[in-house]
């Protein structure tokens, strides 16, 4: 009986993880891809204009912590006093933001 419950719990947790990944992909497509690119490369017109980093690059990924990424998504980013990324803290939940950071980490090659 315990084994059946364990297997069922594992299936539920695994399917939840798939849903989170799909949700993060959708959130990325709707809110981030226009600047950061569908694939996280930053190779878009706006990304080039803003000098967006390529999230495939392991060095780029190593340059910021998950907490820093979460803060940037929540609060936005300013460069020399000019907003270069709008804040999403009023639009996305903490869970959405954490899922986005995990999705960003998945771009690393």
Which role does the model predict for each range below?
Residues 35-44, 106:
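Detector for the c-type heme attachment site
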Residues 45-58, 72-107:
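Axial heme c-ligation environment in periplasmic c-type cytochrome domains
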Residues 23-30, 80, 107-109:
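Short sequence/structural segments immediately N-terminal
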Residues 69:
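Acidic/histidine-rich alpha-helical segments that form the ligand environment
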Residues 1-22, 103-109:
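Post-cleavage N-terminal segment of exported redox proteins
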Residues 13-29, 43, 58, 63:
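Electrostatic cytochrome c docking/interface patches
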Residues 30-38, 100:
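The canonical Cys-X-X-Cys-His
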């Amino acid at each position: 009986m315990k084994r059946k419950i364990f297997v069922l719990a594992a299936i539920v947790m695994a399917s939840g993880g798939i849903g989170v990944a799909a949700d993060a992909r959708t959130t990325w497509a709707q809110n981030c891809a226009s600047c950061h690119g569908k694939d996280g490369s930053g190779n878009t017109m706006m990304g080039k204009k803003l000098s967006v980093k390529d999230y495939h690059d392991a060095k780029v990924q190593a340059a910021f912590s998950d907490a820093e990424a979460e803060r940037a998504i929540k609060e936005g980013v300013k460069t020399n006093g000019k907003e270069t990324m709008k804040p999403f803290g009023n639009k996305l939940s903490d869970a959405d933001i954490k899922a986005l950071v995990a999705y960003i980490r998945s771009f690393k090659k």
